[in-house]
Amino acid sequence: MYRLVFILLLNLPFTMVRAQVNIWEGTTVHKRVELTPYIAEPRQASGNLTVIVCPGGSYFWHDSEIEGHEVGRWLQSNGINAFVLNYRTAYVPAFITHHRLIFRGNRYPDPQDDLCQAIRYIKANAEKYHVDASKVGVMGFSAGGHLAMSATELFDAEDMPAFVVAVYPVVTMTEPCVHKRSRRGLLGDSRSRNKDLRDLLSLERHVPSTCPPVFLVNCVDDPIVDYRNAVLLDSALTARKIEHQYIQFKTGGHGFGASEQKGTAESRQWKSMCLEWLHKIKKQI
């Protein structure tokens, strides 16, 4: 019995961790933003890659399970360290009412600040989590995909992710294929018509030459986020000669995340294709 307890204690850092940490604790930012680690066992670790997972939810809420913790468990089971980020969103009351016309609420750049701090936190605690600080990337779904890609355009070099995975992402903040709910969620009611912010956060317009490798996937039949968002990003990445892989499925819709039930058999292939891509790029970063 004591031997079993001893073995469990030894392996505690490498089991499926659900001990959430507040990334802003001890800083001047008095917010509670939680990061949930899923650390792969050392014998399974695949090149010691680490992925920060950003669930979608139109910048109003999070699809925390299918696009969050289920993704974390899937990555962990495949030898990849994962941290699920509960970044700040506008929340449901802001979706129902327009109180952010008067009160600031959560809006840009709050989610971006949270992601930047998450990257800094993981790098600063690399030894604690047994991760490689130079191999920390970001994976985002829908609005979380916009957040993930925005890191490549808005963050300083030392905070830049090593790679990005964007799954059915929101990309543009301008017509004709903008996802208006995400735009309102990110910008807030008082700034949703601000042309400068719309331009700044239309990611297809500002791909830097320093952009890290990108894995991009979506479905033509997406009923939520116009599939042309990903097409715009693919074109921009190609024009800038950024290493990337774009996979466009005919069917699958939106919001399937890491689920084995949602989407279609075609769209669920994204996981195996993504793992193959991650195994390829881990030697380059």
Regions from the language model: what does each represent?
Residues 19-46:
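N-terminal cap/lid segment of alpha/beta-hydrolase-fold proteins
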Residues 26, 169-206:
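Mobile cap/lid helix-loop segments that gate and shape the active-site cleft of serine hydrolases
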Residues 33-38, 93-100, 231-285:
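C-terminal catalytic histidine-bearing segment of alpha/beta-hydrolase fold enzymes
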Residues 47-56:
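Short beta-strand element of the alpha/beta-hydrolase
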Residues 63-64, 83-133, 263-267:
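Catalytic nucleophile-loop/oxyanion-hole region of alpha/beta-hydrolase
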Residues 64-83:
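Short amphipathic alpha-helix adjacent to the substrate-entry channel of hydrolases
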Residues 116-181, 198:
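Primarily recognizes the serine-hydrolase "nucleophile elbow" in alpha/beta-hydrolase
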Residues 210, 216-218, 222:
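Short beta-strand/loop motif that positions the catalytic acidic residue
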